[in-house]
């Protein structure tokens, strides 16, 4: 059996390795133009899913940071804690750099004889893949290619009228296992630890404010309740 996965993304890399481990042949087909770079992006993975990834491939070099509790604040309540998510002595989830986990699974898949990477010059060629009888199963996990637009054009969309700004702050070393979410008048701001001296920041700012980078940095420092920032956000 040969399976085709459309899109060179984290979802398909994990799926491809899992299928290949069952001795199935997998082709990962992708258009270079559709590749998105996530240099500073971080993702949260639940403990169960993280354990599953490690169990699936024990040699995978995934650098993850445990988050034991999440605190929620609101600017309207003068930054008083609204509530906290916490499981005693158990990590709520793990934070990992997208680039780290992506590169880890890409390296694993590249060395697997049952997995092939195939580049297509234009996403319009995807129609020929649909009609290719050598594939028993075809899975499309891209959100914006020709096939998605053609076959999945009915969808519900929600426009939040905001832009997400991401970065990483270097700060004085502390015990850093608490994630923080602050609802500000500009939009929600999250501080997501990735080490004892580095924290990922995600600030979703409503478009109506049209803030410059220097103003955004000043707001992050203003709403920062925990960290002693060493230098400008990267």
Question: What role is predicted for each listed range?
Answer:
Residues 4-8, 17-41:
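Glycine-rich FAD pyrophosphate-binding loop
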Residues 12-13:
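N-terminal Rossmann-fold NAD(P) dinucleotide-binding loop
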Residues 143-233:
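Conserved FAD-binding catalytic core of PHBH/FMO-like flavoproteins
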Residues 18, 108, 168:
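Rossmann-fold NAD(P)-dependent oxidoreductase module
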Residues 65-152, 157-163:
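Conserved N-terminal helical subregion
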Residues 7, 30-32, 74, 169, ...:
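Short beta-strand/turn micro-motifs composed of small residues
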Residues 53, 105, 191:
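Residue-level signal for inorganic ion chemistry
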Residues 38-74:
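N-terminal FAD cofactor-binding segment of flavoenzymes
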């Amino acid at each position: 059996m040969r399976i085709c996965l459309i899109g060179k993304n984290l979802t398909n890399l994990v799926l491809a390795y899992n299928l290949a481990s069952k001795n199935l042949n997998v082709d990962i087909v992708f258009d270079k133009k559709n590749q998105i770079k996530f240099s500073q992006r971080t993702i949260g993975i639940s403990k169960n899913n993280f354990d599953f990834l490690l169990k699936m491939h024990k040699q995978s070099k995934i650098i993850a940071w445990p988050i034991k509790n999440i605190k929620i604040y609101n600017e309207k309540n003068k930054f008083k804690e609204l509530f906290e998510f916490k499981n005693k002595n158990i990590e709520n989830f793990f934070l990992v750099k997208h680039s780290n986990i992506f590169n880890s699974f890409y390296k694993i898949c590249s060395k697997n004889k049952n997995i092939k990477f195939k580049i297509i010059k234009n996403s319009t060629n995807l129609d020929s893949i649909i009609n290719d009888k050598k594939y028993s199963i075809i899975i499309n996990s891209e959100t914006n290619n020709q096939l998605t637009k053609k076959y999945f054009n009915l969808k519900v969309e929600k426009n939040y009228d905001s832009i997400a700004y991401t970065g990483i702050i270097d700060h004085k070393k502390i015990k850093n296992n608490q994630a923080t979410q602050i609802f500000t008048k500009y939009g929600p701001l999250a501080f997501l630890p990735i080490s004892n001296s580095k924290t990922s920041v995600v600030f979703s700012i409503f478009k109506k404010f049209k803030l410059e980078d220097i103003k955004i940095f000043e707001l992050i420092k203003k709403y920062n309740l925990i960290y002693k920032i060493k230098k400008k956000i990267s």
